From Swiss-Prot:
HAMAP family (UniProt xref): RimP
Localization in the cell: Cytoplasm
Protein name per Swiss-Prot or TrEMBL: Ribosome maturation factor RimP
Organism placement in taxonomy: Bacteria, Pseudomonadati, Pseudomonadota, Betaproteobacteria, Burkholderiales
Coiled-coil blocks: none
Gene Ontology BP, a term: translation
Role according to the record: Required for maturation of 30S ribosomal subunits.
Protein family according to the UniProt entry: Belongs to the RimP family.
Domain of life assignment: Bacteria
Length: 168
């Protein structure tokens, strides 16, 4: 069987849809997560579902149910393009190795500085983008953590949601 992610990505080519994830779950569920720059609409999910149903049938992909949805507000970030796209947004990262006894950091993602101008020793990550994360170490003490994608175990958007609404 061909790589399911690659097959799905190929099937969605030209649809202005970004494939975020393909996951097999219990009881034959095949979960496909998509995104668009201007947000995922229900019509996008319907269109992708119809397209993938046909492709998966032709390719003999075994599944009982197909679920197509958006990544939600806490969307995972997996590659450099996604990190660049969400620069300026609040994210949460988990480092592979603890830093000052801490692995999980939340803050504002900074885009990489051009040509290694960060002042970091670039020998370990030669040619790799060095991103920054502005976080509050202590109250009113903003620090910047520099990292490459190899330094992190996982990352996701971490928006601050206000459920109180406007007061009238």
């Amino acid at each position: 069987m061909a790589d399911l992610f690659a097959l799905t990505e190929e099937a969605l080519a030209g649809m202005d849809i970004e494939l975020v994830d393909v996951e097999r779950a219990a009881m034959g569920l095949l979960r496909v997560t998509i995104d668009r720059v201007d947000g995922v609409r229900i019509e996008d999910c319907e269109q992708v579902s119809r397209q993938l149903s046909r492709v998966y049938e032709v390719e003999n992909i075994d599944y009982k149910r197909l679920e197509v949805g958006s990544p939600g507000v806490d969307r995972p970030l997996r590659n450099e393009a996604e990190f660049r796209r969400f620069a300026g947004e609040r994210i949460e990262i988990k480092l592979r190795e603890a830093l000052d006894g801490r692995k999980v950091f939340s803050g504002t993602l900074r885009a990489p500085e051009a040509d290694g101008a960060s002042g970091q020793d670039d020998t370990a990550g030669a040619g790799k983008a060095v991103f920054g994360l502005e976080f509050e170490a202590k109250k009113n003490d903003i620090q910047v953590l520099s990292f490459t994608l190899d330094d992190i175990e996982r990352a996701k958007l971490d928006p601050v949601l206000d459920f109180k609404g406007k007061k009238r």
